[in-house]
């Protein structure tokens, strides 16, 4: 979603775009321990997000060769966009927040903000497509059923829409040293320091775009998914009641309860992970004076970190709580371990062979000439 651009991951003007944001710069520094813990947390989320989503994509790719599955196609797209979020949001945001300046150049200033917004949009719209697919599967099983081709078309459309939606960010971001010009600290220390911020023709344009973006990247998808999953839960509850009256198949009733829990968890987790960051962004856009304090950057980083946790939780809900995916994951890990052991064994065998050949060569070289 819209990430406040205190960092490149944000889709908004940073507090650094105004030199007054540095009023506390000389006397206020984030605690070293807090920054260290933040860096460790970012690293853990980055590793878990990439590994979890790569595992899902690998498993789905193998299963897709056996049979085309709409749900798996959409989950793979979600995982791909989540990987982009991990790669393009977490490292740049962490470094920018810790260093308090932008070090990656003007091109990356524009590109990272653009790619981050695109990947975040794709992740959220992928969740919407999954909600639609599950709604049709459970609530309206006799109606229109999305096919694999429909899934691919849907994926193409959300990528195209996300690319177009984020173009204003590509055009508005630039580098500036303005926040460092009026510091009372030695100017030599900050002579080459710059920040990556948005620049709009007017505050009205910036507010209009940022508000529209946060609506499209958070509130509208959340409301849509809430309605879809609410109808799904109601539908499953009615089926559970029928099963109770007929005293049929208790295992099916248990499975439906598990699905209910998972669906509710999906919506709650999505809303909870992104709520702090979007709240921060709304406050910054409309009441930014409230945020001009010592720990502004630290508060932003914590909110951003919580949002990034969603990239780790999505594989959990959409894959690892699925029994079939659990089995496939075990098989994947087994194959990886076996491959590693086989490679090691072959290397040892080749090394031994070379050693034996060397010894043989030495023995031949020392055979007396008269024999």
Swiss-Prot record:
Residues 1-31, 94-111, 172-213, 285-297 are extracellular. The keyword Glycoprotein applies. Residues 53-72, 133-150, 235-263, 319-371 are cytoplasmic. Its main location: membrane. Gene3D superfamilies: Rhodopsin 7-helix transmembrane proteins. Glycans are attached at residues 11, 18, 182. Expressed in hippocampus, striatum, hypothalamus, cerebellum, small intestine, colon and adrenal gland. It holds the Pfam family 7tm_1. One of its GO terms (cellular component) is neuron projection. InterPro entries: GPCR_Rhodpsn, GPCR_Rhodpsn_7TM, NeuroY6_rcpt, NPY_rcpt. Disulfide bonds join 109-196. The chain crosses the membrane at residues 32-52, 73-93, 112-132, 151-171, 214-234, 264-284, 298-318. Keywords: Cell membrane, Disulfide bond, G-protein coupled receptor, Glycoprotein, Lipoprotein, Membrane, Palmitate, Receptor, Transducer, Transmembrane, Transmembrane helix. GO terms for molecular function: neuropeptide binding; neuropeptide Y receptor activity. It is found in: Cell membrane. It is a multi-pass membrane protein. A lipid is attached at residue 336 (S-palmitoyl cysteine). Receptor for neuropeptide Y and peptide YY. The activity of this receptor is mediated by G proteins that inhibit adenylate cyclase activity. Belongs to the G-protein coupled receptor 1 family. This is Neuropeptide Y receptor type 6.
């Amino acid at each position: 979603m819209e990430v406040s651009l205190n960092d490149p991951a944000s889709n908004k003007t940073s507090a650094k775009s105004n030199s007054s944001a540095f009023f506390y710069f000389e006397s206020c520094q984030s605690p070293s321990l807090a920054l260290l813990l933040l860096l460790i947390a970012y690293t853990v989320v980055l590793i878990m997000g990439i590994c979890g989503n790569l595992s899902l994509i690998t498993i789905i790719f193998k299963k897709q060769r056996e049979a085309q599955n709409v749900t798996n196609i959409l989950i793979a797209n979600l995982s791909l966009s989540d990987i982009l979020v991990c790669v393009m949001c977490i490292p740049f945001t962490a470094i920018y927040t810790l260093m308090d300046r932008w070090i990656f150049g003007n091109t990356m200033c524009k590109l990272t903000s653009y790619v981050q917004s695109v990947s975040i949009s794709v992740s959220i719209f992928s969740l919407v497509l999954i909600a639609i697919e599950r709604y049709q599967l459970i609530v309206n099983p006799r109606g229109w059923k999305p096919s694999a081709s429909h899934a691919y078309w849907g994926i193409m459309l959300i990528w195209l829409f996300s690319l177009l939606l984020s173009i204003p960010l590509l055009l508005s971001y630039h580098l500036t040293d303005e926040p460092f010009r009026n510091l009372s600290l030695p100017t030599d220390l900050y002579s080459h320091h710059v920040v990556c911020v948005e620049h709009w023709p007017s505050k009205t344009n910036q507010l209009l775009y940022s508000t529209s973006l946060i609506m499209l990247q958070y509130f509208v998808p959340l409301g849509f998914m809430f309605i879809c999953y609410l109808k799904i839960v109601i539908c499953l509850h009615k089926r559970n009641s029928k099963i109770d009256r007929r005293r049929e198949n208790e295992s099916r009733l248990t499975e439906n309860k598990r699905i209910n829990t998972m669906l509710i968890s999906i919506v709650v987790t999505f809303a909870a992970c992104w709520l702090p960051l979007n709240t921060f962004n709304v406050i910054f856009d409309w009441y930014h004076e409230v945020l001009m304090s010592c720990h502004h950057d630290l508060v932003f980083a914590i909110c951003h970190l919580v949002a990034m946790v969603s990239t780790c939780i999505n594989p959990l809900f959409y894959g690892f709580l699925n029994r079939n995916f659990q089995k496939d994951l075990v098989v994947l890990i087994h194959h990886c371990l076996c491959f590693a052991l086989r490679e090691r064994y072959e290397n040892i065998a080749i090394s031994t062979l070379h050693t034996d050949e060397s010894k043989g060569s030495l023995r031949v070289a020392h055979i007396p000439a008269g024999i």
